[in-house]
């Protein structure tokens, strides 16, 4: 049921997941380092565009993501036009025994229909200010499509690189003329090797 007769995914959620984390062919000359990388959807279409938009949301949250019908401006939560819709808080707590500053952005009561990012919590290592983990809660109903997604990302150090260690996704979405898709997964990434 996951694949059609030609080996393609029947589900868009599975196709996006596979496109983000797996490759069908060997990949040469790519370092996969996102630090300093400028994400852009320019010249992209279809699934490639949507994969890049997801990368933008994962690695550069709070920025405007072009090309998302009705919600592009609603992802830029730190812009003046959106910031008044949120309560922002800084706290200090341990995360997996690491002392962290915890930055939480949560939608204000009554503003839920004006936003896409309902809540985002980021744990920063108190000594290095590197991201230790981030949780996202997203939802929107545009009439012809809707979604509700919760994601968790845990980071780890591999040498001098900060890389995702655990990714959790629990969500559902519906687009006009398509069946509702629900997905729950946990991706545990390991055995990182740096070449070159």
Tell me the role of every PLM-derived stretch.
Residues 122-124:
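Non-globular disordered terminal and juxtamembrane segments underlying protein topogenesis/assembly
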């Amino acid at each position: 049921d996951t694949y059609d007769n030609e080996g393609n995914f029947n589900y868009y959620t599975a196709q996006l997941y596979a496109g983000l984390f797996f490759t069908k062919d060997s990949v040469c000359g790519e370092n996969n380092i996102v630090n300093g990388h400028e994400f852009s959807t320019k010249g992209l279409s279809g699934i490639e565009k949507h994969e890049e938009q997801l990368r933008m949301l994962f690695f550069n949250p709070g920025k405007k993501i072009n090309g998302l019908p009705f919600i592009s401006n609603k992802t830029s939560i730190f812009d003046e036009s959106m910031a008044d819709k949120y309560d922002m808080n800084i706290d200090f707590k341990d995360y997996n025994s690491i002392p962290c500053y915890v930055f939480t952005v949560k939608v204000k009561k009554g503003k839920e229909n004006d936003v896409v990012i309902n809540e985002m919590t980021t744990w920063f290592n108190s000594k290095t200010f590197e991201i230790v983990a981030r949780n996202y809660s997203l939802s929107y109903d545009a009439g012809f499509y809707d979604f509700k997604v919760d994601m968790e990302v845990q980071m780890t150090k591999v040498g001098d690189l900060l890389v995702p260690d655990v990714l959790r996704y629990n969500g559902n979405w519906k687009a006009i003329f398509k069946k509702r898709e629900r997905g729950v997964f946990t991706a545990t990434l390991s055995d990182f090797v740096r070449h070159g």
